[in-house]
Amino acid sequence: MKQLMMSDVTPEEIFNQRRQIIKSMGLGIATLGLPNIAFAEENVSELKALTFKAASKSDLALTPENKIIGYNNFYEFGTDKAAPAKFAKDFKTDPWQLEISGEVENPFVLNHQQLFNTFPLEERIYRFRCVEAWSMVVPWIGFELARLVEMAKPSSKAKYVVFHTLYDPEQMPGQKNPLFGGSIDYPYVEALTIEEAMNSLTLLSVGLYGKMLPPQNGAPIRLVMPWKYGFKSIKSIVKISFSETRPKTTWESLAPTEYGFYANVNPNVDHPRWSQGSERVIGAGGLLSVKRQPTLMFNGYEDQVAHLYKDLDLKVNF
């Protein structure tokens, strides 16, 4: 199997931009690998602890907290894995408003406090699989998206649930500088079918490791769908709308032959530039202890979600 390089798992234009940024900073290309995440630990203790129902016992080995908060894709804060922790540390998430609108009987707005107290919070230990063929295990805290959907009371026209990330170029340097933010047409947009949104695995997360989400992980609220590639799990959400028509999502618009609408984890459907048959596990060890493991269909959640796609050709609808 081909050994993946950073240029393999990143769209070519964005990788070349990243090289240019790193070079202008006087850093070596080796910086593009697993980052030095010591700086990510500085703010861990400052995050507010949450009250939640603990997860049931899991056999999954958790990825250490400092790696979860120090190795991220959040292009609004830069395309390098270490950039979000560095450039999001002063990101202001309070005050915040999450607008619920569209084809619903009950549109509403949640403020920052209401994100944490409107619905009972619970812990979910989920596998997290990036489309770049690396994975983690994360102890998320949040509530089922289905609870919010039920409160909104979608009409019979609502076929899709559409999410928008905050657009704030003054706080998000990747939105202000196309070179720094991967030339994405912001704000970041994602969407699900209404059936996917109602699945009990679909989580709106407000925390991890017992505390509020760090900014680089999508504070104050993000989507988590453990059977899909990570780019579907949109961060720092300010708007959720219900639509009759399917929108073009951000990565689908950028590279439709590489990043599909459904983005289900599927070891039998390779990315055009690399295999999805296995993944690099980011665990407790250092660089020399990083291991590869076979990728599971739907990331190991086949029993819970396969029925959603029984009438789809997953090689076409990837």
Curated annotation (Swiss-Prot):
Alphabetized SUPFAM superfamilies for the sequence: Oxidoreductase molybdopterin-binding domain
For this UniProt record, the keywords arranged alphabetically read as follows: Metal-binding, Molybdenum, Oxidoreductase, Periplasm, Signal
**Cofactor(s) for this protein?**
Mo-molybdopterin
For the ligand (Mo-molybdopterin), the binding residues are 72, 75-76, 130, 165, 217, 222, 233-235
User: Residues of the signal sequence?
Assistant: 1-40
Write down the chemical reaction(s) this protein catalyses. Answer: L-methionyl-[protein] + a quinone + H2O = L-methionyl-(S)-S-oxide-[protein] + a quinol; L-methionyl-[protein] + a quinone + H2O = L-methionyl-(R)-S-oxide-[protein] + a quinol
GO annotations of cellular component type: periplasmic space
Keyword Oxidoreductase belongs to the record: yes
Q: Where in the cell is it found?
A: Periplasm
Cofactor: how bound: Binds 1 Mo-molybdopterin (Mo-MPT) cofactor per subunit.
Note the Pfam families from the entry: Oxidored_molyb
Q: What GO MF terms are annotated?
A: metal ion binding; molybdopterin cofactor binding; oxidoreductase activity, acting on a sulfur group of donors, quinone or similar compound as acceptor
Q: Name one GO biological process term.
A: protein repair
Role this protein plays: Part of the MsrPQ system that repairs oxidized periplasmic proteins containing methionine sulfoxide residues (Met-O), using respiratory chain electrons. Thus protects these proteins from oxidative-stress damage caused by reactive species of oxygen and chlorine generated by the host defense mechanisms. MsrPQ is essential for the maintenance of envelope integrity under bleach stress, rescuing a wide series of structurally unrelated periplasmic proteins from methionine oxidation.
Q: HAMAP family recorded for this chain?
A: MsrP
Tell me what this protein is called: Protein-methionine-sulfoxide reductase catalytic subunit MsrP
Native source species: Haemophilus ducreyi (strain 35000HP / ATCC 700724)
